[in-house]
């Protein structure tokens, strides 16, 4: 045999035959329909942060169309805790997907990677084999496991490798798009331009990629900081006298008024519009001024030389300015009752569109939480964040005639701006999470009736039963699964990402953006809280990386906190996160009552809450034992 023939025979014998691929293939066709290309994809994101999802399919439902339109006009970047998806031509083998709860690796068939740090984000995955109202057949949907929050303003990639198998048991083939130098239009070019980021991160492993999308997560920090600093500069002062309403054994109650800037456009209650207006620098633009009332509880005891420490209360939906002072019809039985004996004053206001601030003067808070107008819901929350900035500025210069509280022993009662605290409850915890992130004056905070994940809010919440409300609002059929993997719900959650508590939590200690010094935070959970179920609370606790006071009542809390390197800690504890104290306390709900309210109705919870702030006022916040007094 001639030498050339021998060489050809040797080459043929030594080269392995190509491995067969599955008939199921990933679909990446940017010239097709909406779900024929992966999402998020950089070609849908505009330079101003708005998102073009105008071709999102589904029935002509008013709320769905409003979500599509508002993301196109008022969106602020892709979500960090929202869903991603990729369609396939046929069914896959679900057993080839990564297991939930197992730490991700680059050997997984599907993973989400931070292309700037190379960190992997744990995922929750679902393959939707059947068509539903808002999703096609054979759609693979991934969400970050709620509580693992991808970094803000950072390039990420959702990657499917050839370790994913089709229903025939064979590996899915590589999408031709990954090796094409051109074609597919502007959106295809936008993704193609970012693929080198993934190639660099994966190196030789890039050859095993079957499909991928590369995108930059949104960042709410810059806008939050602009809102806070602009509102902080508003000239804040009490309008007229601060008058005494009544006295209780431990404190006196006062009421006053102040003006606040309103940044939302349009007419209240914002059934239309309601979006904040921003200038070219990103600062909010004042549309008008509104006069609101505040309530103030002043301890009936000697005032410290620097003034009383002051807690700012952010009430739940419908709560009045007196929510920290009274408990329903029980005057003087609010949390001010346990703060005042420890020398801590308290102040509160109503939310916008609540009580006398609502059109007609008697709002119960429903229109604040306006799901029918998603951008107004988002910016109602941000408007309240701005108002607490104004209130904090007011409080630094606020004085009360000392003769009104003789026990204070001062001619003029003042408040110590170096010892300001925040407590947000329920809806107020969403606002409070942002306030904690944005204002350096606040040195410690408590969030009660609190949790994370707008996706969970839309599908898990029992009070109100959100999944049952979502169905008619979005025109679901009985065959539809109302879960976190439904793409239309990601549109809603993306709109609300700037007020997502899980996004705020890293900014309390670990990822300081809108503030420069860390803060101590206490999460208070009742089990079961039907407004924020344990998985929702755990998601927030994970994102904040708190420790739970031992023994934990919810075993899943221990398991899930372990994923982020925290867990049970014996009380008392403090300074467990650098110099800050980050804790979660859990209590059983009282009989026939919802765990949502344990901070108000369990005596031992009230004391533990008060001790947290009393110790913060002394220099270091401490999570004390439930059955112990203050240190």
Mark where each language-model region is.
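Sec-dependent signal peptide recognition
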Residues: 1-7
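Bacterial signal peptide processing site
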Residues: 14-16
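Acidic, low-complexity Ser/Thr/Gly/Pro-rich repeat segments typical of extracellular/periplasmic
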Residues: 20-269
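Short, solvent-exposed loop/turn and secondary-structure capping segments
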Residues: 97-101, 122-125, 153-156, 167-178, ...
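A conserved hydrophobic secondary-structure block that centers on an alpha-helix together
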Residues: 135-162, 166-167, 287-332
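C-terminal subdomain of alpha/beta-hydrolase-fold enzymes, centered on the catalytic histidine
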Residues: 141, 376, 380-383, 443-631
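Cap/lid segment of the alpha/beta-hydrolase catalytic domain
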Residues: 268-291, 303-411
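Primarily recognizes the serine-hydrolase "nucleophile elbow" in alpha/beta-hydrolase
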Residues: 394, 400-461
């Amino acid at each position: 045999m001639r030498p050339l023939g021998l060489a050809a025979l040797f080459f043929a014998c030594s080269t392995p035959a190509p491995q067969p691929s599955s008939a199921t293939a990933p679909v990446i066709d940017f010239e097709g329909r909406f779900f024929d290309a992966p999402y998020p994809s950089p070609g849908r994101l505009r330079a101003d942060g708005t998102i073009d999802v105008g071709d999102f399919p589904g029935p002509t439902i008013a709320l769905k169309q409003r979500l599509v339109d508002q993301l196109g006009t008022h969106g602020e970047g892709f979500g960090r805790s929202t869903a991603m998806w990729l369609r396939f031509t046929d069914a896959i083998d679900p057993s080839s997907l990564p297991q939930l709860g197992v730490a991700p690796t680059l050997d997984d068939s599907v993973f989400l990677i931070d292309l700037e740090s190379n960190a992997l984000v744990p995922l929750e995955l679902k393959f939707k084999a059947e068509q539903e109202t808002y999703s096609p057949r054979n759609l693979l949907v991934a969400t970050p496991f709620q509580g693992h929050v991808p970094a803000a303003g950072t390039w990420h990639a959702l990657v499917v490798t050839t370790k994913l198998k089709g229903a025939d048991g064979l590996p899915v083939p590589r999408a031709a798009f990954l090796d094409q130098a051109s074609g597919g239009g502007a959106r295809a070019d936008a993704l193609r331009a970012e693929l080198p980021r993934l190639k660099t991160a994966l190196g030789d492993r890039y050859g095993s990629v079957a499909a991928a999308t590369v995108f930059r997560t949104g960042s709410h920090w810059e806008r939050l900081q602009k809102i806070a600093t602009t509102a902080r500069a508003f000239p804040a002062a009490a309008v007229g006298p601060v008058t005494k309403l009544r006295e209780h054994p431990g404190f006196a109650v006062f009421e006053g008024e102040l003006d606040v800037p309103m940044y939302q456009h349009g007419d209240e209650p914002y059934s239309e519009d309601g979006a904040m207006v921003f200038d070219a620098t990103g600062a909010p633009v004042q549309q008008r001024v509104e006069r609101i009332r505040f309530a103030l509880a002043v301890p009936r005891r000697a005032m410290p030389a620097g003034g009383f420490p002051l807690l700012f209360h952010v009430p739940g939906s419908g709560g009045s300015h007196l929510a920290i002072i009274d408990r329903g019809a029980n005057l003087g039985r609010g949390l001010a009752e346990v703060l005042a004996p420890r020398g801590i004053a308290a102040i509160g206001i109503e939310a916008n569109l609540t009580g006398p601030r609502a059109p007609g003067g008697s709002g119960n808070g429903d229109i604040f939480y306006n799901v029918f107008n998603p951008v107004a819901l988002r910016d109602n929350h941000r408007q309240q964040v701005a108002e607490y900035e104004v209130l904090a500025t007011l409080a630094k210069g606020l004085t009360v005639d000392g003769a009104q509280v003789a026990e204070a022993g001062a001619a003029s009662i003042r408040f110590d701006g170096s010892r300001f605290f925040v407590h947000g409850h329920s809806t107020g915890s969403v606002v409070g999470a942002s306030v904690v992130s944005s204002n350096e004056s606040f040195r410690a905070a408590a969030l009660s009736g609190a949790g994370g994940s707008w996706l969970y809010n839309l599908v898990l919440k029992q009070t109100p039963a959100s999944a049952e409300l979502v169905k008619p609002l979005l025109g679901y059929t009985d065959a539809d699964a109302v879960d976190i993997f439904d793409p239309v719900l990601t549109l809603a959650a993306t709109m609300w990402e700037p007020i997502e508590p899980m996004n705020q939590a890293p900014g309390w200690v670990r990822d300081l953006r809108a503030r420069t010094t860390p803060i101590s935070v206490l999460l208070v959970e009742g089990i079961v809280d039907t407004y924020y179920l344990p998985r929702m609370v755990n998601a927030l606790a994970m994102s904040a990386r708190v420790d739970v006071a031992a023994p934990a009542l919810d075993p899943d809390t221990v398991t899930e906190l372990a994923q982020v390197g925290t867990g049970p800690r014996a009380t008392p504890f403090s300074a467990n996160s650098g110099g800050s104290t980050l804790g979660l306390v859990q209590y059983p709900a009282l009989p026939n009552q919802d765990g949502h309210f344990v901070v108000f109705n369990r005596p031992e919870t009230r004391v533990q809450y008060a001790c947290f702030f009393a110790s913060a006022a002394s220099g270091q916040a401490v999570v004390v034992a439930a059955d112990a007094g203050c240190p």
